[in-house]
């Protein structure tokens, strides 16, 4: 006779919602101020003769509201790999060679910070979820980080390649399902990005390149996710209440990217900003309706900083006070757009600032919050969060 349903589920499922138990971040040591970046960029790409294009790029950088960014690529590395700095040159091999090593390496740095905060042995990690849009290989970066960290060989791995900037939300959604449906699971989530795949020299016929070069940067973030925390050894940071994914209507082709011999080439339509802005409230309503929440200013936020204009558009459509996006704008200013890692950096900034400012909770003193991932598709990931009290 088969066991009763409740009995069967109790053997395999956790009873509570997934929790963020620890957060770690990492960046390459090479930092370039945004005000210096146009000179650097046009020098290393041998494009200083394109004076009009450089002036346009300077204006884009000023409008970005980014102060500095971290990069693996340096002038010396680009000299050693000239194809990466030349628009349209066959350079996929050079890019891949860098990324196959550097993505797991940077991911490991972030993971070690999270594991140290968690305070438990790595033998307790049961699952790995790794997300990146920076290169591809078999076995994947999930395998590499498992080996680098010395995790159990029977750890269950999920590799998320090439989903773009919304993949931080995707990784959290997948980790939530794993943690809640596997009793005792502890999931290591890693999101790592490196501009070695998207770096290109300027081209007068592909101005989208300039937008990306003014915004993209390198970084990795990691979390430990688990349900039913073992208190007091484990200390929850946020509760993950629900997770949703939505394709924005009539947005086909608004953001697309393709891999060619020149690396990843990306294309942006002018209607990206209004498409996100005009549809964000419907995504929020779908996520929060069952909790009776419709006052968007009552929430704390981690919004993917896909550019100043996108953040501004979402703030306007939701009627958000500027304070609600302080952490999002801080990450945009101090790190730029690190793709999938950004929303986790913002969660880290939120909980740290909340403690520094003596707020009552990890969510800037608020109880409920929302993580919003944005990217190609157009795709929106919404993760409903609850903060925890700060002791």
From Swiss-Prot:
<dbReference type="Pfam" id="PF02797">
    <property type="entry name" value="Chal_sti_synt_C"/>
</dbReference>
<dbReference type="Pfam" id="PF00195">
    <property type="entry name" value="Chal_sti_synt_N"/>
</dbReference>
<dbReference type="GO" id="GO:0047181">
    <property type="term" value="F:tetrahydroxybenzophenone synthase activity"/>
</dbReference>
<dbReference type="InterPro" id="IPR011141">
    <property type="entry name" value="Polyketide_synthase_type-III"/>
</dbReference>
<protein>
    <recommendedName>
        <fullName>2,4,6-trihydroxybenzophenone synthase</fullName>
        <ecNumber>2.3.1.220</ecNumber>
    </recommendedName>
</protein>
<dbReference type="GO" id="GO:2001293">
    <property type="term" value="P:malonyl-CoA metabolic process"/>
</dbReference>
<comment type="similarity">
    <text>Belongs to the thiolase-like superfamily. Chalcone/stilbene synthases family.</text>
</comment>
<dbReference type="InterPro" id="IPR012328">
    <property type="entry name" value="Chalcone/stilbene_synt_C"/>
</dbReference>
<comment type="function">
    <text>Type III polyketide synthase involved in the biosynthesis of benzophenones and xanthones. Produces mainly 2,4,6-trihydroxybenzophenone together with minor amounts of tetraketide lactone, triketide lactone and diketide lactone. The preferred substrate is benzoyl-CoA, but can also use acetyl-CoA, phenylacetyl-CoA, hexanoyl-CoA, cinnamoyl-CoA, p-coumaroyl-CoA and salicoyl-CoA.</text>
</comment>
<feature type="active site">
    <location>
        <position position="165"/>
    </location>
</feature>
<keyword id="KW-0012">Acyltransferase</keyword>
<dbReference type="GO" id="GO:0102735">
    <property type="term" value="F:trihydroxybenzophenone synthase activity"/>
</dbReference>
<dbReference type="GO" id="GO:0030639">
    <property type="term" value="P:polyketide biosynthetic process"/>
</dbReference>
<dbReference type="GO" id="GO:0016746">
    <property type="term" value="F:acyltransferase activity"/>
</dbReference>
<dbReference type="GO" id="GO:1901787">
    <property type="term" value="P:benzoyl-CoA metabolic process"/>
</dbReference>
<keyword id="KW-0808">Transferase</keyword>
<dbReference type="InterPro" id="IPR001099">
    <property type="entry name" value="Chalcone/stilbene_synt_N"/>
</dbReference>
<comment type="subunit">
    <text>Homodimer.</text>
</comment>
<dbReference type="InterPro" id="IPR016039">
    <property type="entry name" value="Thiolase-like"/>
</dbReference>
